[in-house]
């Protein structure tokens, strides 16, 4: 009985109920839930992730910069926050879950998702039917949405804001500021950081490769001048079509005889080049 009471109490805020929150889509659909993380208003592109584990890796993946992530798996946060981060911070604009575990159990746990979201000022909402939401996104396509705790929102005004919202320039926000090298004794790989998860460079380095990580605005001439054995274009956020300068540099990389391979955004940019 005491364990049940403890679980019940941690879902409340003081003596009152948890703060109500709303997720509003640009087609006018509204989901009601409870606020987790920051309580500020948030507008972003809404996307979904179907992973059953690895929610911390999702939260710290730079590919989600400029997006609010819907987790389709129904229970999130049951092992808390661990050191398994893909970058130095959290990137999504917002976080949407069905149920948030507030009693994580893990010997490596260093905190809760609730505290993690607050630390990085990320608004979130729990109590949403995330699978129904995902079906909407799947059938109607990705759309913008707002998370708000304001119960007196004007729906028409919100929809107008959502339809005019556009994500721009996110690659420049997530790339490294200057190049750095992971020493190795094997092949030399040039990694163009478009928002790379740390495990990409680590996995190459673990296999003996010397990995030089370059900022996204690095020229093809500089990369080729380093005489790499291979070039890798990383994952990253945003619309690939807006990365016109990077696409032009990739075209120049094609003119070299160096093998090129890519992940996620990098692969899309290769196709556009």
Positions of predicted regions on the chain:
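Short, Lys/Arg-enriched N-terminal segments with co-localized hydrophobic residues
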Residues: 3-18
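Cysteine-nucleophile active-site neighborhood
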Residues: 230, 234-273
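RNA-binding accessory domains that recognize and position tRNA/RNA substrates
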Residues: 17-221, 225-226, 240
